[in-house]
Amino acid sequence: MKIHEYQGKAILRKYGVAVPRGEMVTTREEAERVANDLMHDGAKGVVVKAQIHAGGRGKGGGVKIAKSVDEAGQLAGKILGMTLITHQTGPEGKKVQRLLIEETLPIERELYLSIVLDRSNGKPVFMASAAGGMEIEEVAAKDPNAIIKEWIEPGYGLGAFQARKIAFKLGLKPELIGQAVKFMQALYKTYDETDASLVEINPFITTSDNRLFALDAKFNFDDNGLFRHPDLKDLRDVTEEDPLEVEASKYGLNYIKLDGTVGCMVNGAGLAMATMDIIQYAGGMPANFLDVGGGANAEQVTHAFEILLSDKNVKAVLINIFGGILRVDTLATGVVQAATQTKIQLPIVLRLEGTNVEQGREILQKSGLNFIVAETMKDAAEKVVAAAKGVK
């Protein structure tokens, strides 16, 4: 689960991580009020920041600096309601419905900090770079040595000696080292206690008056840990998520929308990824990742089918099932129900193996629906790609 920057900063503030003063607003009038309050309280200006679940907002025109209350209001009026397009939103962009109005700060240096789970090592890794304010992937590609890494023992946490090592490698002033150690340890405590899978501060800044701040905040949370954090679960903004993905989550389905034309329904994440690979190998592009899971029932399969077909880009469907816990006859019943209810006109290719496969094939045959049967994954991929391209 992702959250907005203003929500992330509220969490950081709770854990003692310094963030600029600011407030989320949804109207021009609110923006002017917050800007007025901040400037009366010593701010030299304010930053008007679009709040969407995507990076690259500055380049897309979603982050602007205002030197006066009137200018803050004008900028808020322009940004609110705009469709912001960045390298992470896709060409369709995202509509801006809220803003963060924040004080400007006397920035001296922009750096980068993040904590993410390193699955290969089975522990969190604290990453830092002197190249802040940039896409960290670009920095790593140009110079891998520019990324400082410290692996953290979960049972111990981020040691002060590790934080000091990072601070020295970043070239921080001696008078900032102690402050930086506290900042980094508070950041790790935030990551650990919220069950986050990613906390990213880009940029992490030093100011001309020797203070440290998180100028931006990005959080990803492990969905499997949200039951322990009802307060975090309430921060979810479904308007920022794909409607089909939101609908799928209601039925316990793992669905991710992609840009292709071949709809996929598979049981098991590994088989689903292999199916997507073989579709591309056959010259097609998958329209989605859809894992119905091992314990799906006929009703869930029906919902999965309806969600898959709701994507207008889908030109053909591949159902690739290896029956284990999810029996093939259960899958077949759900597919027939969904195909009958939706009066589907698209080609459907099925590759079925495993538990109760003969019963499943019998259900499909008796349905009277026109399915294309494939014996192997290669055969299935070739048939569905041809069908998506209109080749008979």
Swiss-Prot record:
Transmembrane segments: none annotated. Its cofactor is Mg(2+). GO terms for biological process: succinyl-CoA metabolic process; tricarboxylic acid cycle. Residues 9-247 form the ATP-grasp domain. One of its GO terms (molecular function) is ATP binding. Gene3D superfamilies: ATP-grasp fold, A domain, ATP-grasp fold, B domain, Succinyl-CoA synthetase domains. Pathway: Carbohydrate metabolism; tricarboxylic acid cycle; succinate from succinyl-CoA (ligase route): step 1/1. ATP binds at K49, G56, R57, G58, E102, L105, E110. It catalyses: succinate + ATP + CoA = succinyl-CoA + ADP + phosphate; GTP + succinate + CoA = succinyl-CoA + GDP + phosphate. Its EC number is 6.2.1.5. Keywords: ATP-binding, Ligase, Magnesium, Metal-binding, Nucleotide-binding, Tricarboxylic acid cycle. One of its GO terms (cellular component) is cytosol. Binds 1 Mg(2+) ion per subunit. InterPro entries: ATP-grasp (IPR011761), ATP-grasp_succ-CoA_synth-type (IPR013650), ATP_grasp_subdomain_1 (IPR013815), Succ-CoA_synthase_bsu_CS (IPR017866), SUCC_ACL_C (IPR005811), Succ_CoA_ligase-like_bsu (IPR005809), Succinyl-CoA_synth-like (IPR016102). Mg(2+) binds at N202, D216. It holds the Pfam family ATP-grasp_2. Substrate binds at N267, G324, I325, L326. Succinyl-CoA synthetase functions in the citric acid cycle (TCA), coupling the hydrolysis of succinyl-CoA to the synthesis of either ATP or GTP and thus represents the only step of substrate-level phosphorylation in the TCA. The beta subunit provides nucleotide specificity of the enzyme and binds the substrate succinate, while the binding sites for coenzyme A and phosphate are found in the alpha subunit. Belongs to the succinate/malate CoA ligase beta subunit family. HAMAP family: Succ_CoA_beta. Heterotetramer of two alpha and two beta subunits. PANTHER family: SUCCINATE--COA LIGASE [GDP-FORMING] SUBUNIT BETA, MITOCHONDRIAL, SUCCINYL-COA SYNTHETASE BETA CHAIN. This is Succinate--CoA ligase [ADP-forming] subunit beta.
